[in-house]
């Protein structure tokens, strides 16, 4: 209530317009919140430059890194954002767990969102004193199984090397883009110069749900719909897309199968 949202415009390639971003600041700006990598278009946003611009206006920044952390080397110290968040399952860990990184000075200001054991220092009928960081945010018995599994997943990808993962996935993206562009009626959404290994597309007049369902019958896993980004779909003038997301365990042979599957579905309509 009382909060006004200002949306950063994007160009036809799916890139944020930095000039217009700079014009959005005013003395009432309290927070900049932006995704590091679009889970729909794959656009890698220039978050470091955006953080620097926000700090010129003394505005804190929250970065959603759910689509970035599994695919890019992320250094929160270098980015200098006040907050950086990501989910566990997208980085090959378990579901139901995520990470909030925050600068200590900001986390100290935030009240606990949940009560329970370990998150208090002293308690009486008159008042409660909260525990120090990070314990004031960890009420009750923690999900130590989930956190242990997530830590192991992070160790695994770091062992592979995030630079190696990013380079290989970029090779897959370029190969897949070339293969899909050769398909009649193909429309790929998101043509940013800096892009993660995500392809959102439509083929002719085939509904995205139909394409996804038929690809599933061929053993090809994709996502369909608005991908939790309805305002983006409205901006693109569509209801949804088919989305393929590539990872380090995918191969060019699988992309060949994927492209052949799309072509097979296309010929059904």
Predicted regions located by residue number:
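Pyridoxal 5′-phosphate
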Residues: 1-269
């Amino acid at each position: 209530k009382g909060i006004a949202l200002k949306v950063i415009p994007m160009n036809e390639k799916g890139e944020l317009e930095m000039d217009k971003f700079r014009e959005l600041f005013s003395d009432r700006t309290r927070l900049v919140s932006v995704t590091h990598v679009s889970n729909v278009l794959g656009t890698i946003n220039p978050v470091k430059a955006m953080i620097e611009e926000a700090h010129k206006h003394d505005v804190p920044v929250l970065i959603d890194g759910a689509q970035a952390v599994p695919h890019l080397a992320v250094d929160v110290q270098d980015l200098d954002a006040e907050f950086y968040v990501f989910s566990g399952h997208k980085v090959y860990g378990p579901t139901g767990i995520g990470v909030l990184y925050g600068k200590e000075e900001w986390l100290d200001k935030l009240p606990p969102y949940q009560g329970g054991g370990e998150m208090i220092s002293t308690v009486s009928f008159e008042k409660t004193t909260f525990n120090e960081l990070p314990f004031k945010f960890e009420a009750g018995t923690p999900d130590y199984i989930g956190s242990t599994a997530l830590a192991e997943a992070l160790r695994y990808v770091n062992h592979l090397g995030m630079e190696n993962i990013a380079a290989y996935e970029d090779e897959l993206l370029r190969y897949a883009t070339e293969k899909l562009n050769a398909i009649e009626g193909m429309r790929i959404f998101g043509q940013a110069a800096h892009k993660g290994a995500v392809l959102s597309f439509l083929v002719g007049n085939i509904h995205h749900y139909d394409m996804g369902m038929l690809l599933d019958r061929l053993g090809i896993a994709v996502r369909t719909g608005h991908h939790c980004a309805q305002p983006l779909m409205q901006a693109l003038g569509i209801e949804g897309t088919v989305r393929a997301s590539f990872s380090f365990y995918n191969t060019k042979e699988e992309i060949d199968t994927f492209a052949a599957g799309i072509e097979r579905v296309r010929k059904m309509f």
